[in-house]
């Protein structure tokens, strides 16, 4: 769709979160007639601002006005099966994601990143790499999408030489049809959000694969060859785009001349050694999962033809990401680690593997069909205490109580208090929920900030 095509078009925006509000702003800028429809309460200042600019606004439910539209834009948090979406589809009204909308107006080069785990870390790292190169080349790099900054809120600033590093969830990709990155990366596929996909991991994987559907012959897909689902899907021939596999387990397919891989502590691009892990594994940025994130980031940077020297220097300087195995403080003889970004069991497993020594694990939140058997051995081997918290505390407690001491906490405040009481000296308290945050918090960031605040209140 072209910019001029929006003038006078009727558009319903479903959901007034960050993405929905940014979509409204972009649509209004291009002359669309907008209805913002929110099923819950709406901030009065936001509603007033949009009304003053000519938008219609409704809250506390969706009226039939939603269906008087040329198309709709849906926020990623709105489930696909809710009545308002089903009715839009029944009436054959096109439904797009905010990412799709923003892509119509994007002049910049687009790098797309999706996967179950490592998306935010990898997207942040690639954005830092592109930013470092851009300082030399006179262009800018933007980190947008699921990383927390709506694509629509930045797209008007972007120019042709800029790079938009777009992190994409499966929710956002579901409603993309023409989104076309220059290069894309899939970090991995493990069980997550299966409540949304009828318990079928392949339906979930299909949503992730949509990142590559428009790559075309000039596009490149970087994928994790250590992931059996991705390897089976993309190691075959006959694809319309080129592929770059990466692996932490040595040369991909036994061929040292291709792919990005880790061998003897060195990152290789084909036969070339690029950088040793000792140059970037430090502080909170450690563990084999971060080696995987680095390989994917380097693969994507190479697909974008970014200057190698600047890319590797940006990697050396990368501090890690807030809420992902983030060191918070030493209190009462124990280190406290914030891993609120761990919203599934695989991310919890990665944290358990990365954190050395004995631990107290705080886990729980809103369950997403979790199977804790994947971490049962690690918890038994490393944890002296599990504090099961939030909405899923009973399920978490039942999963681990046969192997380790377990206590339950309804709130995060109680969980921190119980962890502090049970940690003693020399243990690490790891907050790695393995669940969604929506039982008690707005999002994982809100949850992580709350955890850090509670730790800050503890006496040293």
Curated annotation (Swiss-Prot):
Task: Give UniProt keywords alphabetically.
Answer: ATP-binding, Cell cycle, Cell division, Cell shape, Cell wall biogenesis/degradation, Cytoplasm, Ligase, Nucleotide-binding, Peptidoglycan synthesis
Any single Gene Ontology cellular-component annotation:
cytoplasm
Pfam families for the chain = Mur_ligase_C, Mur_ligase_M, MurD_N
**UniProt cross-references to InterPro entries, sorted A to Z:** Mur-like_cat_sf, Mur_ligase_C, Mur_ligase_C_dom_sf, Mur_ligase_cen, MurD
BP-aspect Gene Ontology terms: cell division; cell wall organization; peptidoglycan biosynthetic process; regulation of cell shape
Give the source's domain of life in one word.
Bacteria
Gene3D superfamilies cross-referenced by the UniProt entry: Mur ligase, C-terminal domain (3.90.190.20), Mur-like, catalytic domain (3.40.1190.10), NAD(P)-binding Rossmann-like Domain (3.40.50.720)
Function of the protein: Cell wall formation. Catalyzes the addition of glutamate to the nucleotide precursor UDP-N-acetylmuramoyl-L-alanine (UMA).
Q: What is the similarity comment for this entry?
A: Belongs to the MurCDEF family.
Instruction: Output this protein's name.
Output: UDP-N-acetylmuramoylalanine--D-glutamate ligase
Query: What organism is recorded for this protein?
Result: Chlorobium luteolum (strain DSM 273 / BCRC 81028 / 2530)
């Amino acid at each position: 769709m072209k910019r001029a095509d929006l003038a006078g078009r009727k558009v319903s925006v479903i959901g007034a979160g960050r993405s929905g509000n940014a979509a409204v702003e972009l649509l209004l800028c291009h002359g669309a007639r907008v209805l913002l429809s929110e099923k819950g309460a709406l901030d009065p200042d936001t509603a007033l601002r949009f009304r003053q600019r000519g938008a219609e606004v409704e809250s506390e439910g969706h009226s039939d006005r939603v269906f008087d539209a040329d198309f709709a834009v849906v926020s990623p948090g709105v489930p696909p099966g809710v009545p308002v979406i089903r009715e839009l589809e029944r009436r054959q009204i096109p439904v797009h994601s905010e990412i799709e909308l923003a892509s119509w107006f994007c002049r910049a080069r687009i790098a797309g990143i999706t996967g179950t785990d490592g998306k935010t870390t990898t997207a942040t790292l690639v954005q830092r790499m592109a930013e470092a190169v851009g300082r030399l080349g006179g262009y800018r790099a933007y980190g947008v999408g699921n990383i927390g900054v709506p694509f629509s809120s930045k797209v008007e600033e972007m120019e042709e030489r800029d790079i938009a590093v777009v992190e994409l969830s499966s929710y956002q990709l579901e409603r993309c049809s023409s989104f076309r990155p220059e290069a894309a990366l899939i970090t991995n596929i493990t069980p997550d959000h299966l409540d949304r996909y009828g318990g079928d991991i392949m339906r979930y994987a299909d949503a992730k694969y949509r990142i590559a559907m428009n790559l075309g012959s000039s596009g490149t897909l970087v994928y994790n060859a250590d992931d059996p689902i991705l390897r089976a899907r993309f190691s075959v021939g006959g694809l319309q785009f080129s592929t770059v596999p990466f692996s932490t387990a040595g040369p991909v397919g036994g061929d040292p001349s291709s792919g990005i891989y880790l061998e003897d502590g060195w990152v290789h691009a084909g036969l070339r050694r690029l950088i040793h892990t000792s140059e970037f594994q430090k502080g909170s940025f450690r563990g084999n999962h971060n080696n995987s994130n680095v390989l994917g980031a380097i693969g994507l940077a190479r697909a974008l033809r970014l200057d190698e020297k600047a890319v590797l220097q940006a990697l050396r300087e990368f501090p890690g990401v807030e809420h992902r195995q983030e060191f918070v403080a030493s209190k009462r003889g124990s280190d406290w680690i914030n891993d609120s970004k761990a919203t599934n069991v695989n991310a919890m497993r990665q944290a358990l593997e990365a954190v050395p020594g004995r631990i107290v694990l705080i886990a729980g939140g809103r369950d997403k069909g979790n199977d804790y058997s994947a971490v049962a051995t690690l918890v038994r081997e490393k944890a002296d205490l599990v504090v099961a918290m939030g909405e899923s505390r009973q399920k978490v407690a039942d999963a681990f109580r046969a192997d380790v001491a377990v206590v339950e906490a309804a709130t995060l405040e109680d969980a921190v208090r119980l962890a502090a009481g049970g940690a003693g000296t020399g243990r690490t308290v790891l907050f790695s929920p393995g669940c969604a945050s929506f039982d008690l918090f707005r999002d994982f960031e809100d949850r992580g900030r709350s955890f850090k605040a509670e730790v800050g209140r503890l006496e040293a």
